[in-house]
Amino acid sequence: MRTLWIMAVLLVGVEGNLVQFETLIMKIAGRSGVWYYGSYGCYCGSGGQGRPQDASDRCCFVHDCCYGKVTDCDPKADVYTYSEENGVVVCGGDDPCKKQICEVRQGCGNLLPRHKDTYEHNILVFPAKTFAKKESEPC
């Protein structure tokens, strides 16, 4: 349990408000984003390079690309408002910046459950820097 707590504390600063994103993924996908996607493929988790390995990894690739287009706010720190309706993330709030962050995560949160059947356990903890030698796709 202590290891899990340490891991969570260390990861909070890696990809924005990870606790909030983890909660979103748990609600929508019904599984832990940290355990299932924290170091999955070439793009799920911190950083990324190479070609996405499957549909879930592509979702993370698109998520990373969209983060680069968020303007006038800090997607790595700002907290956004959302709700879940019938298994779909719905962004709320009046702050346009925070709404952009939510929409980036909304896309990924709504797509990951669709790819649960194609999740490849053999690319969990995929050493992207070693094996993803192909040039990265443009966003």
Swiss-Prot record:
Enzyme class: hydrolase
Subcellular location, record wording: Secreted
GO cellular component: extracellular region
Residues annotated for Ca(2+) binding in this entry: 45, 47, 64
Cofactor(s), names only, from the UniProt record: Ca(2+)
SUPFAM superfamilies in UniProt: Phospholipase A2, PLA2
Cited Gene3D superfamilies: Phospholipase A2 domain
Disulfide bond entries: 44-60, 65-139, 73-97, 91-102
Signal peptide residues on this chain, from the entry's feature table: 1-16
Tree of life domain: Eukaryota
Gene Ontology annotations of biological process type: arachidonate secretion; lipid catabolic process; negative regulation of T cell proliferation; phospholipid metabolic process
Similarity field: Belongs to the phospholipase A2 family. Group II subfamily. D49 sub-subfamily.
Protein name: Acidic phospholipase A2 BpPLA2-TXI
